[in-house]
Amino acid sequence: MFNKIFSWFENRLNPYPESNPTTPKKGLFRFIWSSITGMKGWIFLLAILTVGTGVMEAVLFQFMGTLVDWLGTFTPERLWQEKSHLLIGMAALLLISIVWGFLASAVHLQTLQGVFPMRLRWNFHRLMLGQSLSFYQDEFAGRVSAKVMQTALAVRDTVLTLANMFVYVLVYFITSGVVLVALDSWFLLPFITWIILFGLILRTLIPKLSKTAQRQADARSLMTGRITDAYSNIATVKLFSHGSREATYAKRSMQDFMVTVHAQMRLATSLDTLTYATNILLTLSTAILGIILWKNGQVGVGAIATATAMALRVNGLSRWIMWESARLFENIGTVNDGMNTLTKPHTIVDKPQASPLQVKQGEIKFNDITFAYDPTKPLLNHFNLTIKPGEKVGLIGRSGAGKSTIVNLLLRFYEAQQGEITIDGQNVLNVQQESLRRQIGLVTQDTSLLHRSVRDNIIYGRPNATDEEMVLAAERAEAADFIPFLSDSQGRKGYDAHVGERGVKLSGGQRQRIAIARVMLKDAPILLLDEATSALDSEVEVAIQESLDKMMENKTVIAIAHRLSTIAAMDRLIVLDKGQIVEQGTHAELLELNGLYAKLWNHQSGGFLSESAE
């Protein structure tokens, strides 16, 4: 029965809403308010339940004081005769408070505690997936993931602290004030004095804790980013024997983090000591005042018991308030830190009226394109290029000539400052990004695989592919000969073996063959090859070239290679220099022209451009 009740509360909120998330607004409260869309009703319900809990607890203290007076006045028989209805009513209230407390706990713990941060992580993660490549070039991947995880928890704790703790405390103190006035208004004096002193303590120390928490969140993000950076590039670290250097590099960020920890703990100790002192003052002053009022005949023993019990309750509450306040501002610091990243708008977005790209022929046009990574240094300046349907074009030029930039602009990883790029007459700015990239297959020299199984990496090209289609793609990519012999630390073998982060368990050639298999399985009408066979040895390259040739049939192809022999057979070669087309034609035509292409060809050593040519 209880499991069904728990399940009902647990299923009130969907942790994975299907609606597309919107970028949260800047500003602490605007950020939080826009992040909790879809959960506000349950948060409000929790606040209402908390109000009831605070009222019932204060009423219970008042009743216990009254009961003390009754016990000193009535005999047991007379007490039951005259006050039985009140005793039964209070017993009923206690039973109701149990159910009420269960509802408050169920809403808090079952409905909100776990689902709240997961829902935020789901939305934040999808927002980060929509960021451009330039965003990730400026950020540590580990730092971004840490902010997604930590900010979600911090938003939850901030909201629930306000809805639970602060609402409870506010209602409890208001109700207690009413009860104390009913006993004797003088009892308010020590409580008001305590509130003023405690408020001054919090006002003085909590802002300092907040600033320290902000510095600590920044230091934690930097520390996490540096550590993750070392792990992500562990091969480079070991290759240059810089383990100690990386440890020292991370240690500096750890030391900065510890400075913030010590500062935070000093403030915490001061806050704890001052709070304890004010609590002692409240308890003593309430007891002494109660005795004085009792001596003067103004109150009974029950009133003293009620006031003293409330003072002791405040004693316990104050430590809860103190640490929850400290945690609140620590969480606010974390939210502020994460907000700087999570509120960054997407720089490349689909237009509201964007339609899916329809590729029927595969004609590509670059019309008057001007683009620069640095606005002061244009890379492409009024660039024009038309690639006919089904044409195979090779891009050639020194490093920095703009070859990869042309590919990135076609994929809309970046957007040109001027001009337009069209595919079959459709401006890439006017089509949906996902549909654009679904129609393009890309193999690059920097092949990154997901830290998943070989199967998952290959079918990434076409998730609905059958196992037979996946294996056929692996065979065509000359990958089927080594995949059956792969294994991982969990005992998984072959296509089920995991390849490690970025495919680190595989050789460069193996990674590239799996990447080629993935693109072969995708079978997109437009194919981009950016040094697609650079990591393959000559024997494997010869074996795979036939499959690549077959894959290129009836497709529009743009290929980039420093090994000119691999693209010499293309329909047309485009020679770039400083973002401009300086030569174009077939291999034979360009050699006869005796220009830059001929110079690069003559400088080749072993099929690659030599350093002097670069």
Curated annotation (Swiss-Prot):
Pfam families: ABC_membrane, ABC_tran. GO terms for cellular component: plasma membrane. One of its GO terms (molecular function) is ATP hydrolysis activity. GO terms for biological process: transmembrane transport. Its main location: membrane. It comes from the Bacteria. The keyword Nucleotide-binding applies. ATP binds at residues 397-404. The chain crosses the membrane at residues 41-61, 87-107, 157-177, 178-198. The keyword ATP-binding applies. PROSITE patterns: ABC_TM1F, ABC_TRANSPORTER_1, ABC_TRANSPORTER_2. Residues 43-330 form the ABC transmembrane type-1 domain. Residues 364-603 form the ABC transporter domain. It is a multi-pass membrane protein. Keywords: ATP-binding, Cell membrane, Membrane, Nucleotide-binding, Transmembrane, Transmembrane helix, Transport. It is found in: Cell membrane. Belongs to the ABC transporter superfamily. This is Uncharacterized ABC transporter ATP-binding protein HI_1051. It comes from Haemophilus influenzae (strain ATCC 51907 / DSM 11121 / KW20 / Rd).
